């Protein structure tokens, strides 16, 4: 991974939407108002097309609403997704509190191997 340039600054927001459509709509408005480059999301309503990168079960996502925040790479795992941009890898993770301890430890182990 290449080190980020010194003069790059990203505005990053993080939120758990609880699978609520109204919360996601409000988030998109806040993103526009604040000029966010990256939004790390858990339990999104659903991906909103271009600029959204989600794991297979739509529990973790990263939204890149700003066109200048171009992604370089992305990867999806069980409970997580990452996007690499400007030499920085950003993860969004969600592990259900209803998972068994065995499932949770397996998911954490998979994430740890990826990092």
Report residues per predicted region.
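A shared catalytic/ligand-binding motif for oxyanion handling
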Residues: 1-115
């Amino acid at each position: 991974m290449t080190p980020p340039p010194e003069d790059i600054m990203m505005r990053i927001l993080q939120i758990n939407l609880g699978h609520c459509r109204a919360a996601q709509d409000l988030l998109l408005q806040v993103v526009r108002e604040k000029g966010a480059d990256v939004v790390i999301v858990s339990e999104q309503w659903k991906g909103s097309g271009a600029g959204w990168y989600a794991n297979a079960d739509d529990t973790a996502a990263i939204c890149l609403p700003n066109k200048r925040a171009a992604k370089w790479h992305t990867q999806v795992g069980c409970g997580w997704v990452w996007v690499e941009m400007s030499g920085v890898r950003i993860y969004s993770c969600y592990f259900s509190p209803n998972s068994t301890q065995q499932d949770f430890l397996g998911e954490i182990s998979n994430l740890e191997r990826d990092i």
